[in-house]
Amino acid sequence: MTVDLDWENLGFNYRKLPFRYISYFKDGKWDEGQLTEDATLHISEASPALHYGQEAFEGLKAYRTKDGSIQLFRPDENAKRLQRTADRLLMPEVPVDKFVDACKQVVRANEEYVPPYGTGATLYLRPLLIGVGDIIGVHPADEYIFTIFAMPVGNYFKGGLVPTNFLIQDEYDRAAPHGTGAAKVGGNY
């Protein structure tokens, strides 16, 4: 049913799993997409994702329930947020049904890596949308890659979630006007 891992001590680290999903946008449309064992993205050195940050990502989890079934947590909401981010970055939207289906394919293909119920671990999915192609000027790409890879993870923080005191400053806003503060892009992290 599952692989032999120390499920309760995974941490939040990359682990290469057997399968991931990849789809290409070219000539104004997405291809069908497919599962692949190739964990390498082959892109042009002139890709806008590398020079101008034309990339977006999501993060969502699949978990095993008490009865052994596997659930994805709100993949449609992640798909909609990726669409909003894509729109903000002048990228083509990934249709919600394509996004959700791709997530399901990745989970099914890597099912043995979905941690057992009760361990506190989950299967983390990382959807990624990047602008590729030979574009060196400051304008949107004409080709894109949408990919999803997965890995079993534990808590993001080593000690788990621990309450902490903090101060919320509401007098200043460091976000640039009309910027990417509401988008899930690498430049915000």
Per-range role (PLM):
Residues 1-106, 135-189:
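Helix-start/capping segments and mature chain N-termini
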